[in-house]
């Protein structure tokens, strides 16, 4: 069964991001423990000694669960969850490594060896589940980050639109202010023209009223002189009115 132990242990070590040195040390310890098994009490038919290369007891390992690189700390807020999942995966590998180093489950009977294989297989399954959980957490973090980026871009677009509106109304307000000053200047200039014209109009009006009053008085005096038979005075008044 050494081939099965080697493959299962090597896969778990790779999944828990162990170094190459640790992998060599563990494989060496597994080989030493198996070489120390008592031969007399063992079932030689069920436990043939095979080379680690080309062992028929090699465990089938899903291709989809091959070693991956965990990009921890990529996303703010999700990095903590990803790190914790990685720590759980490494702890699972540590537990299995400790089990191999201390020789837990190593017995002289086929039953003990079968139990030991079941323990390794369960640890392998748990490690794969932890490994998958890391990527599920990371995918969730990616989606959350994309949603946050979408909200950020939407906010930037709204902010840009508000700035455009603000700039437009600011420019319009500046234009209206300029127009107001222009109109105020024009009205001031018109006032400087209208005021003298108004004064002149009032002067002309007063002169006309005086002229009409003088004519009325002259006609009254002329009629009175004519009725009195004073023709010299009447003629004099006629000459004065003609000169007006």
Curated annotation (Swiss-Prot):
Stretches for region Disordered: 37-56
One Gene Ontology cellular component: extracellular region
Sequence motif: RxLR-dEER, positions: 50-68
Keyword field: Host cytoplasm, Host nucleus, Secreted, Signal, Virulence
Main location: secreted
Biased composition (Basic and acidic residues): 37-46
Entry's localization field: Secreted; Host cytoplasm; Host nucleus
UniProt keyword Secreted, yes or no: yes
Segment forming the signal sequence: 1-21
Induction section of the entry: Expression is up-regulated during the early plant infection stages.
Entry similarity comment: Belongs to the RxLR effector family.
Role played: Secreted effector that suppresses pattern-triggered immunity (PTI) in plant host.
Domain text: The RxLR-dEER motif acts to carry the protein into the host cell cytoplasm through binding to cell surface phosphatidylinositol-3-phosphate.
Name of protein: Secreted RxLR effector protein RXLR-C05
Chain's gene name: RXLR-C05
């Amino acid at each position: 069964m050494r081939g099965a132990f080697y493959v299962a242990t090597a896969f778990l070590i790779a999944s828990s991001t162990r170094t190459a040195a640790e992998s060599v040390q563990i494989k060496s310890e597994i080989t030493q423990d198996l070489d120390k098994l008592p031969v007399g009490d063992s079932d030689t038919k069920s436990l043939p000694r095979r080379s680690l290369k080309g062992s028929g007891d090699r465990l089938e390992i899903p291709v989809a669960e091959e070693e991956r690189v965990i990009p921890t700390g990529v996303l703010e807020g999700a990095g903590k969850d990803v790190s914790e999942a990685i720590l759980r995966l490494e702890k699972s590998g540590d537990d299995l490594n400790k089990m191999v180093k201390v020789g837990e489950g190593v017995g002289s009977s086929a039953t003990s060896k079968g139990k030991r294989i079941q323990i390794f297989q369960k640890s392998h399954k748990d490690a794969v589940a932890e490994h998958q959980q890391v990527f599920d957490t990371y995918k969730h973090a990616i989606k959350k980050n994309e949603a946050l980026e979408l909200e950020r871009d939407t906010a930037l677009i709204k902010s840009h639109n508000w700035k455009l509106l603000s700039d437009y109304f600011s420019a319009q307000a500046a234009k209206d202010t300029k127009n107001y000053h222009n109109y105020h200047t024009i009205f001031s200039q018109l006032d400087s023209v209208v005021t003298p014209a108004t004064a002149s109009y009032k002067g002309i009006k007063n002169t006309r009223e005086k002229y009409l009053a003088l004519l009325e008085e002259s006609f009254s005096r002329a009629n009175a002189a004519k009725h009195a038979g004073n023709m010299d005075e009447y003629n004099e008044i006629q000459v004065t009115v003609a000169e007006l």
